[in-house]
Amino acid sequence: MISVSKLYCGGTAESDGLRYGHGGQGPQVGPGAPPTSKTAAQRRPVTVWNVTRTCNLRCIHCYTDSDAKKYSGELTTEEGKTLIRDLADFEIPALLFSGGEPLARPDLFDLVEHARSLGIRPTLSTNGTLITDDTARQIKRAGFTYVGISLDGIGEINDRFRGVGGAFDRAVRGFKACVGVGQRVGLRLTLTRHNFANLHGIFDFIEREHVDRACFYHLVYAGRGGQIADDDLSREETRQAIDVILERTEDFHRRGLNKEILTVDNHVDGIYLYLKLRDKDPARAEQVLKLLTWNGGGMYSSGVGIGDIDFQGNVHADQFWMHHAFGNVRQRPFSRIWTDTSDPLMAGLKDRRAKIKGRCAPGICKWFDACGGAMRVRADLVHNDPWAPEPACYLTDEEIGFTAEKQKMVKARGEDFPMPAFSRPPRRVSPQPASSPPATSCTGGTEA
């Protein structure tokens, strides 16, 4: 995750310590240093548990290819509690209950309360359509620290994306129900050509509905997401989208609207943000680069700082890497599977510097230490090689220092991979409506 609010505008948020060290300021060292002060490489993984594959919607980008039916092999309640005890002993920083649609699982609140009793910080990833006022009260009582509700556009745009009419209205109802009981809640949106042109409308919605947190995800071509890979944004479209996100986040900050805006699943965003900030505030930009480098980007993400357990108990490097399992928690505890590097992929993910190829490799891309090669699973899905360059990198050769000499070197190594998302003619983001306040520069001090 790239916290635009923090890095671009100097804001602060509860979860900054997970991404940027103690207090969001980088690491602390010495006796008694808190868990978030560990280096990014040392931290236990934020763990996603897909508690069920069943879902009441049929989203066109669903990485688990879920549907409204019962799937066999789901971990039982007792198996789930055994898993949770192991995760607690392993001292994971957070457990994200996901799906499918996790609220379709009848024992969800029992599992969450068990996690809370063992000191685990539980969060919920949901489509929001099943959240009534009563459900919101249950969510609050169970002890979820955060609820992320998925929306992928306004009105019919979202419903087409979600595969069910009325999904937008029901998700908004769920969001408001959570707000009504004092539950911390935010929105999750995946950037595609379906919603790209309406980004300003989405930000207007965020302001109008008093959304305090919004995460903008880049498309990953897993599950049904692979069927809509052509709907991913081109390089130019991605730059436009991130520009809008930066501009509107600046405007929120300038007007004193305390909103946490993040981008997810493309660590290139951090470098792009840094380059934009460098032109405006070089001193703060260097502070931002230090935080990005401490975080390590993709280097400490999949297989290191994030992991996944699917509904049948299979362990994956992240929630998009369903095509490769390292083991099953019915046979071995997650803690043992996660620390076992006998699988070449797990070993590589935990020490990937020497493996990443092409324009992303260290010594080729000058931002490797801060980006870390971005999303390895996207490279694997596109190139059938987890160490290939990030297909969704939208920085130019000049921006990453990919000189003609380096290009010859990469070609000589046989690492001249095609970059498939760059060739389409770009669309344009619709202009900001006249009724929306103008975006201006941040004025919030020098905190990175």
Can you annotate each of these PLM segments?
Residues 77-98, 104-240:
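Radical SAM/AdoMet-radical enzyme domain recognition
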Residues 309-310:
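Short, acidic, Ser/Thr-enriched surface-loop or helix-capping motifs
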Residues 300-303:
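Short, small/polar residue-rich loop motifs at catalytic or cofactor-binding pockets
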Residues 4-8, 320-448:
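Flexible mid-to-C-terminal extensions adjoining Fe-S/redox cofactors in radical SAM and related proteins
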Residues 1-46, 57-58, 253, 261, ...:
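Flexible, acidic/Gly-rich N-terminal and inter-domain linker regions that tether
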Residues 288-298:
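Short, basic/aromatic recognition patches
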Residues 236-287, 314-366, 371-372:
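C-terminal accessory region of radical SAM enzymes
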Residues 3-146:
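Conserved alpha-helical substructure of the radical SAM core
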